Amino acid sequence: MEVPIAAMTFAHPANVMTLASRQPKSKRSHISPATTAHRNLQTRLAHHHHATPASLPMAICNTVDKVINRFIDLPEQRPTVDPRRVLSGNFAPVDELPPTSCHVIRGSIPSCLAGGVYIRNGPNPQHRLPQRTHHLFDGDGMLHSLLIPSASSTLLSEPVLCSRYVHTYKYLLERETGGPVLPNFFAGFHGVAGLARAVVMIARVLAGQINLNKGFGLANTSITLFADCLYALCESDLPYSMHINPANGEVTTLGRCDFGGDLSFRMTAHPKKDPVTMELFAFRYNVFQPFITYFWFDRAGSKVADVPILSLQKPSVMHDFAITERYAIFPESQLIVNPMDMVMRGSSLVGLDRTMVPRIGVLPRYAKDESDMRWFEVPRFNMLHTTNGWEEADGEEIVLVAPNILSIEHMLGNMELMRARVDMVRINLCTGDVSCTALSPESLEFGVIHQGYVGRKNRYGYFGVSGPLPKIKGIRKLDFDLVGSGDCTVGRRDFGLGCFAGEPFFVPDNIDGYGNEDSGYVVCYTHEEDTGESWFVVMDAKSPELDIVAEVQLPSRIPYGFHGIFVKQAELLAQQ
């Protein structure tokens, strides 16, 4: 039985909704027809933004929620989820920004970026200072999109920034009601208060205020391009299809996508697209068995049947995974979901199990079941994000490069205390031998590579330097061929005192995406905390100092967020 993590006990059949009147081109669409109820909701929101008067059941639920927040689970009693702390500085939300021109204040933007768009996703709660506990991961999704003008553009002469919320069902519902309705998953489910919030949520469902068929996720984590469609992702819901207007940079939510009814539950925020076959590989994790379900899509977007994985020991929080040409690789960490601990011990829904030994599971990439699944113990290896995986020795050895979270107990609390070390794990499939080698002495996370090498042996990775996490104070380029040297760093860029960035992204400088692996540019948003200004920065990936070749001053502050991508002009024009 599949159970949505954020709702704990509610079944979640997909019911896809189109959120914009724009219809796709003649290519196959992954978005099902709109429901009448959602069209009515969208119409109401188009005419007004003020809160809808509460019905009696809704008013009762709202009152109980306030009692929980003010007398049972006070934010000030749990500083790590106090919104006054969590949403301070550049973690504070910003307003939406319509397409707005920006100025290139340094250098010139490389031609390989012309006509393309850099998009970064991240949390941005629509209710500025929530009157309840709040974790950074609980904010509504907002895309910050920077469109670079093409050489032939007659409409744009400068880059254009646009910041828009992803119009999830949760976002629209809480925008209409004027306040929080669905509980925060990471901060809200804690002890007696968490149980009480679950009861209130059940009451809201029974009263018809919440329709779980329409989802409850945030779409605040990442964005991916697959089969000519852009998707905003979060592991608590289905993907949301997005559109970036290549003429003016406007960002539009098209709808919640179930891939023609084949994807009936949520999906990881970190699917892997094979750059050769163009297939997309993904999974979801769950509170009850099967804890992990694996699946993939062909290059046209058709989903293959689920592969339930029942050999997982406990409901481990599995945020990311990796693929090689022949295998899918799953990391089992010590971070687990345990509803009974919340109920019986008054702890959080997600916690640390120090008795567990982390494992890595290896499954044939096109497996129809888990009969050939193998698990390998990797002590003290707790992975949140993967960088890449590949095979060596004619497929007898698996290599995985990933930041190892050395203090994973802080991930859901004092994130600034987290330290991550980039490790290379080697698994010999014949002997069962496992080794783990550090690639740098620094605390590095948010690693990216040339996307043309996903699942295949590559040499270079670009990582954010903890500033502390989740802020990034610099970028490091690692050469994986130097493994065993103690420090594989071959390129470095520090942003300076008080200047921080988000996850970098590598953009190859050649049209087809191949050639010299590090021939291209590293891009990201940066923020100067003293002045409150934000920039888009382009760095030469080949230079030892990751020299800045272009800098764009942005008209709005970009809060610290999560993951992003760069979509080249041809891909942008081909999107559905």
Swiss-Prot record:
Cofactor(s) needed: Fe(2+)
Keywords on record: Abscisic acid biosynthesis, Chloroplast, Dioxygenase, Iron, Metal-binding, Oxidoreductase, Plastid, Stress response, Transit peptide
Protein name: 9-cis-epoxycarotenoid dioxygenase NCED2, chloroplastic
GO molecular function, one term: carotenoid dioxygenase activity
PANTHER family: BETA-CAROTENE DIOXYGENASE, CAROTENOID CLEAVAGE DIOXYGENASE 4, CHLOROPLASTIC-RELATED
Species name: Oryza sativa subsp. japonica
Enzyme class per UniProt: oxidoreductase
Domain of life of the source: Eukaryota
UniProt induction comment: Down-regulated by submergence. Induced by drought stress. Down-regulated by glucose.
Presence of the UniProt keyword Plastid in the record: yes
Subcellular location: Plastid, Chloroplast
EC number, UniProt record: 1.13.11.51
Role this protein plays: Has a 11,12(11',12') 9-cis epoxycarotenoid cleavage activity. Catalyzes the first step of abscisic-acid biosynthesis from carotenoids.
Binding site for Fe cation: H270, H319, H385, H563
Catalysed reaction equations from the record: a 9-cis-epoxycarotenoid + O2 = a 12'-apo-carotenal + 2-cis,4-trans-xanthoxin; 9-cis-violaxanthin + O2 = (3S,5R,6S)-5,6-epoxy-3-hydroxy-5,6-dihydro-12'-apo-beta-caroten-12'-al + 2-cis,4-trans-xanthoxin; 9'-cis-neoxanthin + O2 = (3S,5R,6R)-3,5-dihydroxy-6,7-didehydro-5,6-dihydro-12'-apo-beta-caroten-12'-al + 2-cis,4-trans-xanthoxin
Family named by the database record: Belongs to the carotenoid oxygenase family.
Xref: Pfam families: RPE65
InterPro entries: Carotenoid_Oase
Transit peptide: 1-34
CC per GO annotation: chloroplast stroma
